[in-house]
């Protein structure tokens, strides 16, 4: 495929949740809760879900669990939402195997994070992303998050990778709006905001949508924000963006996994606790999160 004529909203979605992975009390994968959560998120306004990403605690799940989770979510909502599978690790060969496994399960696309910890050079990033993109026919989103991976995907590297027929976009958590806007204009790559605090600015730069964490508890608000922006009602988009700001503050304090699982529980949706080394919210953190969610009008 090519970015020329690639319909990212239809093929990948516009308001996607980087979905948490539900675990049972014994720490095992809770597939029933995963199906319920997927349906809840789509019912709330998401047209796409990302499974086994950062917020999905992918470093703590086995390949078999990743496949099972993907299968369950596809069965639950795959006929009415795009399901994107996280397939990135710091091992290229492992990432290729994961990509092929996700394609075999029927994923609609792949999210491939920058190899973390090992700090490869840009030449290594090009080779890594190319190998994963070559492994299947699925559309691939690069995931640029130097706050976790240390190494950024430099603009020149993204431009080079944009020529690959399967690489169609970027999830940006680097916050370089200027560079991202230039790349969107030059390459036609679909950009997705990977930082909820910058959702509205990214739309202004030409982004397709969001791969969001706060959408676990505010999917409808983000859908309304996007709709307002695309219809030209910038004042309403700004108002909605300001309303959900307390959720971004909560995520910054607690981290995406802990905030999302605690927030869902406050809304009556139990997805279990995180796996170590992530930990559940403390009573004090839950009290503060409750106040933030009420301020954002997502909790009574």
Curated annotation (Swiss-Prot):
Instruction: State the oligomer form and interacting partners.
Output: Homotetramer; dimer of dimers.
Q: Which PROSITE patterns match?
A: DHDPS_1, DHDPS_2
Q: Where does pyruvate bind?
A: 55, 211
Gene Ontology molecular function terms on file = 4-hydroxy-tetrahydrodipicolinate synthase activity
Enzyme's top EC category? lyase
Upper taxonomic classification of the species? Bacteria, Bacillati, Actinomycetota, Actinomycetes, Mycobacteriales
Q: Which HAMAP family match?
A: DapA
Q: What is its main location?
A: cytoplasm
Q: What is its EC number?
A: 4.3.3.7
What function is annotated for this protein?
Catalyzes the condensation of (S)-aspartate-beta-semialdehyde [(S)-ASA] and pyruvate to 4-hydroxy-tetrahydrodipicolinate (HTPA).
Where located? Answer: Cytoplasm
**Gene3D superfamilies from the UniProt entry:** Aldolase class I
Provide the site residues for: Part of a proton relay during catalysis: 54, 117
Can you say what this protein is called? 4-hydroxy-tetrahydrodipicolinate synthase
InterPro entries xrefs:
Aldolase_TIM (IPR013785), DapA (IPR005263), DapA-like (IPR002220), Schiff_base-form_aldolases_AS (IPR020625), Schiff_base-form_aldolases_CS (IPR020624)
Q: Which GO terms describe its biological process?
A: diaminopimelate biosynthetic process; lysine biosynthetic process via diaminopimelate
């Amino acid at each position: 495929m090519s970015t020329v004529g690639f319909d990212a909203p239809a093929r990948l979605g516009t308001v996607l949740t980087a979905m948490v992975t539900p675990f049972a009390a014994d720490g095992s994968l809770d597939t029933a809760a995963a199906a319920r959560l997927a349906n809840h998120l789509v019912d709330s306004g998401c047209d796409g879900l990302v499974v086994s990403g950062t917020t999905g605690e992918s470093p703590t799940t086995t390949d078999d669990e990743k496949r099972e989770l993907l299968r369950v979510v596809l069965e639950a909502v795959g006929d009415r939402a795009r399901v994107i599978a996280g397939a990135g690790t710091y091992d290229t060969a492992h990432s290729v195997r994961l990509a092929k496994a996700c394609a075999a399960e029927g994923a609609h696309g792949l999210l491939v994070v920058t190899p973390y910890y090992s700090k490869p050079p840009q030449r290594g990033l090009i080779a890594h992303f190319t190998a994963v993109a070559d492994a299947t026919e699925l559309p691939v989103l690069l995931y640029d998050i130097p706050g976790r991976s240390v190494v950024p995907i430099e603009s020149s590297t993204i431009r080079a990778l944009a020529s690959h027929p399967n690489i169609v976009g970027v999830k940006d958590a680097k916050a370089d709006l200027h560079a991202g806007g230039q790349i969107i204009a030059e390459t036609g790559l679909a950009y997705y905001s990977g930082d909820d605090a910058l959702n509205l600015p990214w739309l202004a730069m030409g982004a397709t949508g969001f791969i969001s964490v706060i959408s676990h508890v505010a999917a409808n608000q983000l859908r309304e924000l996007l709709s307002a922006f695309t219809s030209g009602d910038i004042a309403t988009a700004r108002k909605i963006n300001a309303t959900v700001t307390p959720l971004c503050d909560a995520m910054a304090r607690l981290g995406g996994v802990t905030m999302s699982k605690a927030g869902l529980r406050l809304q009556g949706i139990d997805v279990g606790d995180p796996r170590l080394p992530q930990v559940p919210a403390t009573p004090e953190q839950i009290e503060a999160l409750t106040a933030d969610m009420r301020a954002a009008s997502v909790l009574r």
